[in-house]
């Protein structure tokens, strides 16, 4: 047999082997890899069903069809907000979901939409209010410091549009990949002391992917055409100076008037109860946002006559904001009072008001002698340590869970 024949047979054999392997791979792919279009039935309503290619996560699949499920962490599985009920399909619940979903909920079909792989036809159940959620490209009106580490971001909604939110609600804000240099931040001189002390100007935030985060609104429904946020910059803690700074807060702090920003919403469950009970608002830091929204809504839109008070904790006098607004509301509404407590007042503050942590101030100066603290409704938003201290104090007073309403987004 000539060398040329042997070579030809070798090539032919090799080709056959390659073709067989390709066939095996294609067969395996057809069985194991998602392909083709699938249908997701929603709320047993044929008109709400969506059809799309298999292979994505449920959160992204719904978003691609204009159905936006809340996800403060942007689909990372850490916030636990994107809970939906999967009635059919979706596979087994994953370990990453079990920190947010208990055994009873898992048995009933509740899942994190960001963790569910869409491999075949599915049936899901979504809250009806989700179908009112939309996206808007907004324009930055202003982005000004209200405290050392808090900016007020004011956004203009596109002309002719409106975000039909309720006081206490929140929106999600999006950002594309970007690089932010802290040295480029526009921060008034009066707030430079801590920035210089900790050399915060040295930080750089580099983000390589699309991100989404949730922020409570400081605006209230009657402030038409705008969305207002209070955003605290998430700098690395002093004991971990090499940790990366907060991605979204860094991005928001870099925004300037005229910049475009994509938001979606409205979302929320931190809403005021429709009762005649006394309302006690407790806030700290950027937790001011939903407090402002609620109090303005109660007094300026609803003209509520319910007895209400607002207790706000700040470090020093320069960390107090919206003071003139709340002073005016107090002067105009005999049913409303507000108090500030400074935890670290400066000598130059010449502060004669309350001092200490806000939960202690609230207890010592009001609730300790209140005839029925368990009958009040408590609305709070602030740093986790504040929230925990307030909740413990209220529990010790006999306040039931149903009268303790917490917004986790402030801090």
Curated annotation (Swiss-Prot):
Enzyme Commission numbers on file: 7.2.1.1
Cellular component terms per the entry's GO annotation: plasma membrane
Keyword Chaperone included in the entry's annotation: no
Cofactor remark from the record: Binds 1 [2Fe-2S] cluster.
SS bond partners: none
Chain positions recorded as [2Fe-2S] cluster binding sites: 73, 79, 82, 114
HAMAP family: NqrF (MF_00430)
Quaternary structure, from the entry: Composed of six subunits; NqrA, NqrB, NqrC, NqrD, NqrE and NqrF.
Family classification: Belongs to the NqrF family.
Protein name (record): Na(+)-translocating NADH-quinone reductase subunit F
The gene coding this protein: nqrF
